[in-house]
Amino acid sequence: MQAKTTSEEYVIPNFAQTINNRTIVNIFESCKYRSPLIICALNDAVLAKEYSNSMAMGSGTITFMIDNDVDIMSSLYTTFRTVSTLLLMGNQLCVFIVVPMSVISTDALTAIAYAYRGAMIELRHYGRGDDYVQERLESLFKLSPLCGTPHMGPKYYGPTVFSELLDLSHHNKTSWYSVIDYSMFTRTALVGFASYMMKTLSLNSSIVNIVGYNPPYVWAAMMHGVTIRYIEKEIPNPKGKGPMGLIMPELNGRVLTNKVKYVLHNPQIKLLCLDSMMFMSSRNIVYIGAYPATHLLDMNLRGWNIYAVDPEITQQWISDMKAKTGANICASSRKFMFDVSENIKINEFFGNQPYSIIDDSWVPDNYEQFQDKKRNYFQELVKSDQKVTLITMKWNTRKNVTCEKLLALLPQPYGGKLYEMRAFFHRNGIGSITIDANSVEKYIQKFQELPLGAQVGTQKFMHTMISRVQDVMSIQPKKGDVIIASYSLSNASNPKKKVLEYLTKASKSEAMIIFGAPNLERVKYMRERGVLPGNNITINGEKITFNNPSGKKWTDFGYTNSELLACDMIEVTIEQMVSFMSTSFRGTGYYSNSIYNDLFSWFIPIWVWNQTMQIQDIRLSPVALVKCFTTKIRNLCYVPHSTYYALRGHLVAKMFSENNIENNCYSISGKSNETFTVLKDFKFPTSIGVLEFKAGEKVNISGHLLSLAVAAHFVAVPVTMWARHIKYMTVDRQKPPDVDRILFFDNKIKRNTLEKWHTKSEVILAALIAGEYVGLMLNNFHSKAIVDDLCNTVLATFR
């Protein structure tokens, strides 16, 4: 087939020469490492140039440098348009930014890095010649092509314990760990996004409801200043004593054998799990034995009130804790008396609002007597009319003890070899119970014999105290409710029709709900191509069954974009969420992605999009998707740049011919900035109306749409959002006053006017040829269902 471009003719290569099923599988595999970008901002251009050369020569890193001597917007555009073509090529990419913060803020640069799934290194707080900058760049050079900074997030809690790593490698689980790694990122991103939107939309809620249990949500909530509640259909019986079975629950029961595996928190911080759960129980915390509480310094505790007591407390400690956590703190360096006099001060500080107590106090002498005094005080407190939500205290006693209102007696997930448990008192605790010292000793010994993963898994017992046992779909969603239903509602135990009805109700009631599910057509395509995502997958109709290497098996319903759109839900990728938050995201990043995670898509209500995301800047742009897949295929097939664009012109001409449009009405240009020129007026009928073309008009069909149709076979593509954005930009628009101008570097912007992208006709024509275009690009190894779903969504948007 041929297409005339200028005075020469270019033969369109036969994609069958190189594109076969193995090629498709290789593209899937390359998606695992499609985050090779690092943005490094510093003040020293000489040093940046030196390490740019060293990394390029030493590891094949493709480097770029932007300094303050160039037009910043233009330089950002050319640099990152280049980056977008290279994201699947396998080379590390590093962009050195030597521009003052007054020109490009850390927030803007972080948003750009995350938009391209990159890592952000900010060194502009250090002056030229600072030793730390030299050390950091030397580390970057030595680690290349790896990166010592996680992608898409500032934190990382991977398998840091040697025994854990050894266990993974012995059981052939290391490849599956990238799935867990990325899942941890996903869960913390969802909590961060919910928190960000709660503030942005001024929602009258401080609670995020989590459908489906997984431990990292608690830590993520602490990092983003929100409170969570789990909503579970059922919770396995812990088989201990007490009303919830949490007084010394079984250590070999279904709770632990079915434990959720996840990336560990820092195992050196034994109080992190306990304190995180207690901070979820109340926004008012009495912390007895608070000093030093270093594990809290990294948390976002704005909105929490802490009444801290410890003889070691200093004014400096109070200042640091307030400054770093944002909490409102009342601190006392005297001993806590464990008597009624304390209650008056506590109630005054909390304004007579409910509160929880964390006790981590200890004395060197008469410790048994000290424990008796605390225990008696706490059990009387929960029996009184005081507004006490929950109390936890150390349990080190080595004698038989009878107590009241005990709700739970649990091991400490990171307790190590300590002879110590945690008691929890609550108004609904058991009336009276005698705890046998010998039984406690045997229980602790059994706990210490468990592998680390199982020990950490016991925090599930604690989390049942912040869980609600109910089918979320039986709860009427209300305006302002915040719900995360990812990896949960899509489970096959939830009828698909019922889930779609619930999502419709939630969206229409203006609840802020985030829904995640496998994309049915993408899963089917992956299976047809024989791709192995690290676990076995079988498909039966709309049901998808997963088997992971550890033997866990689960079945989900697959969903499509069209189904969710009918529920007033719009797709947003996790990367868009994180880029939109920028530096407000304080969760975990990752080092490699997984094919398994790319099977999922996430959706938010359209009303949220309408209020916050109606105009596209780099944070919401699909720019990291539109170039890299087609560029990789073009390089595999040695397709010249001019030939690639000639193909588009050829397909448009073919379509016009099939629809009886005379060829003297237009002239095919087949260039990157012009598909054809209109020679005389003509009309072209389509399923959504008649397109009119005027003589002299230069038409450039949407390449973004065509590229997205290819990318949608491999990764989540937010086509509905993109279609709405491009429809909005069929005319010039004013830049939103509250959005940094830098974030529009990928737009054409003059003063504060954003120039239009494409006409309606240019988008519709691209949608109409997309099926044949993708078929040629992938040599008919494509999914008609994926392309049809994408194009029908675009056409419906412009209808």
Swiss-Prot record:
Catalytic EC class: transferase
GO biological process annotation, one example: 7-methylguanosine mRNA capping
Pathway: mRNA processing; mRNA capping
GO molecular function terms listed in the Swiss-Prot or TrEMBL record: GTP binding; mRNA guanylyltransferase activity; RNA binding
GO cellular component: host cell cytoplasm; virion component
Catalytic activities: a 5'-end diphospho-ribonucleoside in mRNA + GTP + H(+) = a 5'-end (5'-triphosphoguanosine)-ribonucleoside in mRNA + diphosphate
Keyword Nucleotide-binding: yes
Signal peptide: none
EC numbers, comma separated: 2.7.7.50
Top-level lineage group: Viruses
Keywords, ordered alphabetically: GTP-binding, Host cytoplasm, mRNA capping, mRNA processing, Nucleotide-binding, Nucleotidyltransferase, RNA-binding, Transferase, Virion
Main location (coarse class): virion
Transferase listed as a keyword: yes
InterPro entries in the cross-refs: P5_Phytoreov
Subcellular localization(s) per the UniProt record: Virion; Host cytoplasm
UniProt record similarity statement: Belongs to the phytoreovirus protein P5 family.
Task of the protein: Enzyme involved in mRNA capping (Potential). Binds to GTP and might have guanylyltransferase activity. Together with the RNA-directed RNA polymerase P1 and protein P7, forms an transcriptional complex positioned near the channels situated at each of the five-fold vertices of the core.
Protein name, as recorded: Putative mRNA-capping enzyme P5
Species this protein is from: Rice gall dwarf virus (RGDV)
